[in-house]
Amino acid sequence: MTEAMKITLSTQPADARWGEKATYSINNDGITLHLNGADDLGLIQRAARKIDGLGIKHVQLSGEGWDADRCWAFWQGYKAPKGTRKVEWPDLDDAQRQELDNRLMIIDWVRDTINAPAEELGPSQLAQRAVDLISNVAGDRVTYRITKGEDLREQGYMGLHTVGRGSERSPVLLALDYNPTGDKEAPVYACLVGKGITFDSGGYSIKQTAFMDSMKSDMGGAATVTGALAFAITRGLNKRVKLFLCCADNLISGNAFKLGDIITYRNGKKVEVMNTDAEGRLVLADGLIDASAQKPEMIIDAATLTGAAKTALGNDYHALFSFDDALAGRLLASAAQENEPFWRLPLAEFHRSQLPSNFAELNNTGSAAYPAGASTAAGFLSHFVENYQQGWLHIDCSATYRKAPVEQWSAGATGLGVRTIANLLTA
């Protein structure tokens, strides 16, 4: 094992020879990061990415100034999907070290799960990984049910069954109940619903290669809400929360769904399929119906749902939609506390009517006359939330995954959003 490179923090600027914009300098003792007080966490993360780019795979965070947030910022930039890295952490008090360890365990799980190849991570594997993670932190406070394949059709989960039936790997619904009260009649405080499309070819509305090559990550919403529940549990969540993961492949076969098909949901809504690549909303609808039936105080769904959200925000922010201004404000406050990027986009009553169909109550995609694709997708989902005007948040996970590295992130999953949702659950 090579000797660790020492990484220290300084509030003094770098020597002028490094240039006026230098954020780090190198000497015989190691590497010094020069904090300027403006965006110290971002500076640390960007510097860590550069350090990894130098091929330095063993570091020691040394000296004064390190806390859990700064250590975590370093790790966010330093971690990458290829190769191994070792960090020797500084001395932290027990609470800060526990917080850091929980982030490393759970958010790394989210990133690694999203990065996993689709060949290794099908619908059943995703559901089981989620069960294993939550059980690891919650023990016997968790019960769950897995429904798959034809059982979904027989029980009326027609959106999930329709999307997933084209794959040899059966679609799966995971319904997990975290109940720390021990009372089977305890009210459900919150429901989390995640889109778990383990590979999205687009179906017969097939994607081009440039848009399909990252579609192993189309289960990012499911991984995010799973991680959020696990992380909230480590922070002392003492209320009952249910998790619904809607897991499927969206593939082409002789049994795959087709344009013009009509799906009838358990709440009576009929949906005409006019784009098989708008499948995420079709599977989420089943999860939202189940969530609404629990009568929780809040429902949060998360999905890598639309390209429109990425067009608006890039990969830098998660898009937030809600009719509930107070609840949206609470989530944005949680995001600010956790230093995670969320941005609210419009969702109005008229978006709910911008999915007209000649043959059903709803179309699963908007027409050229209604180009606000992220907002109309949220409007579609609202039809499956019983009390959509209160207590419902929709997160379009545009910051979940990066196809290419940037100055602060490696290629792949980011894990962003986990801490924000956990913060809201435990507030």
UniProtKB/Swiss-Prot annotation:
UniProt-listed Enzyme Commission number(s): 3.4.11.23
Family listed: Belongs to the peptidase M17 family.
Domain of life: Bacteria
Subcellular locations according to the entry: Cytoplasm
GO MF terms held by the record: manganese ion binding; metalloaminopeptidase activity
One Pfam family hit: Peptidase_M17
Residues the record marks as active site: K207, R281
Cofactor detail note: Binds 2 manganese ions per subunit.
InterPro entries in the cross-refs: Leucine_aapep/pepB, M17_PepB-like_N, Pept_M17_PepB, Peptidase_M17_C
Binding site for Mn(2+) 1: D200, D277, E279
Catalytic activity: Release of an N-terminal amino acid, Xaa, from a peptide or arylamide. Xaa is preferably Glu or Asp but may be other amino acids, including Leu, Met, His, Cys and Gln
GO biological process, one term: proteolysis
Subunit comment: Homohexamer.
Swiss-Prot/TrEMBL keywords: Aminopeptidase, Cytoplasm, Hydrolase, Manganese, Metal-binding, Protease
Entry function: Probably plays an important role in intracellular peptide degradation.
Entry GO CC: cytoplasm
Name of the protein in its database record: Peptidase B
Cofactor(s) listed in the protein's UniProt record: Mn(2+)
Chain positions recorded as Mn(2+) 2 binding sites: K195, D200, D218, E279
